[in-house]
Amino acid sequence: ISYPHPLLKNGLVVLDTPGLNALGTEPELTLSMIPNAHALLFLLAIDTGVTKFDLEVWQKYVQPGATRRVAVLNKIDLMWDDLKTPAEIERDVARQISETSALLDLPRSHVAAISAQQALVARVRGHDALLARSGIAQLEHLLASEIIPAKQEIMRAAVKREIGSMVEASRLALTS
């Protein structure tokens, strides 16, 4: 997919792997990518929040394997109920963000609530109000302010990790 976005022009590369629950008994592709990812966006649906399965995956693979973690609560448009006031909707979204932050032991600033579908519709149609309501700007800001600038640090840690294991293997070979 080619999309002209400033984050992509600044070096952000996105690899979308299948969700673990969609993989059945062969999750190796997704799991093998976690330790090498510069950042991991853990996509959840806002209407279900963090399920028991999500929490198990988070605790077993994401927390120990990913250095930079962001939880993304997608589909906030499902909460846009015409019978609720904007303040009530905002309060419900904020509650779900707080719960997700607590469950995943993430700073609240690393939990974004978005509607990816509405963000795309807004971008295609040039609808600024819908784009703002989609919440995508918060996620883009998080990526732009923390992930892209940290790319050099992330790459340095990855090289150190790779070279460190090679040096250790060489040291063991020499010792034996």
What are these regions (language model features)?
Residues I1-M155:
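Globular "head" domains of long coiled-coil molecular machines
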Residues A158-S176:
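Extended, charged coiled-coil helical stalks used as long, distance-spanning scaffolds
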